[in-house]
């Protein structure tokens, strides 16, 4: 039995500390939707998504009412479209994205992920077509998200793909110049991408996954901050233990909701992603958790150590609360989506270089960072390459979701609204890296990849 104190504590977390389920994401396999005729394949994709996810939003709303826990987003991830579309006669995969968008709109989800390709070791014909289609697809759809995996610890980094993605990010920004480059906010470049990630924009349904599955992403920076403030002045062991216990409680709630959703929908439960995911709302910030640990401002010296402690304690607590942990599982640092990070970047303390250092110890990478619109494709590729190298060498997922905001320069800001928030334009290095990123080929896998 639960004690009255535990019940009241959970109510307080929801009402006062912004505790919520960030997303219930249904993963759907589209491998049986392939067809030589592109139009038929698109129709099959639409039909399968609208059939499998017909009751997803309804189930989420019922669980919200039953348990009193806010579920912010209901989303869908699908098999990487490069795999499904490759057998078709299409030389542009935008119609596949449009079919996904229509299906997402029909079932009422706010995002659908999986306009994706896995090219860490090289390209197939379908991979090239999909990557070439990304700018148009993201500019002409509302709910579709795209991701491309360009590196892994086992295979090294496909630098041809890195350079091409620098160009694609630039094209995405230019196609949505009237919206501050919004298409870039729906595109992620990965190293060591997880196949069961419930969070956007990097979600897709991996080829080793079941026909259909429910994955859950939790959110609780406000809860962790409140707990950290209660142990002010204690030693690091006490601090870590406090975060660990708090993460346990948050993850338990995620597991409960995920299993309830899976049961209602008649599909298997997949994983809980332990990630602390901030929002632009006051009191829902990862940066403020780090500041509660004793930093004057997120981004100052000591930030990386504080984030390492936070990330590790979240994983340890969450792993005890669920048998099935997956996705990214750690602390997110999306600049435009975190009120504390926005503030730190505006005063110049949180820089691109510091964010890169922080990605060495957190769950993902350079996320939702706005940079000057005149940044070249080669510089974008070099930024991506740096981040991929961190992931490759350290056996971890890293990613880049970066926005070269058209017509904007340092001192300006971009406004996306909603969960995507807003961000100041931060500077990049002016020295180029064109000769390096255009060498071509693969950066070999590191020696530590030889594990067998």
UniProtKB/Swiss-Prot annotation:
Instruction: Give disulfide pairs as residue numbers.
Output: none
Q: Which InterPro entries match?
A: UPF0210
Q: Which domain of life is it from?
A: Bacteria
Note the Pfam families from the entry: DUF711
What does the similarity note say?
Belongs to the UPF0210 family.
| Record text on subunit structure and interactions | Homodimer.
> Could you tell me which HAMAP family the record lists for this protein?
UPF0210
The protein, known as: UPF0210 protein Dred_1672
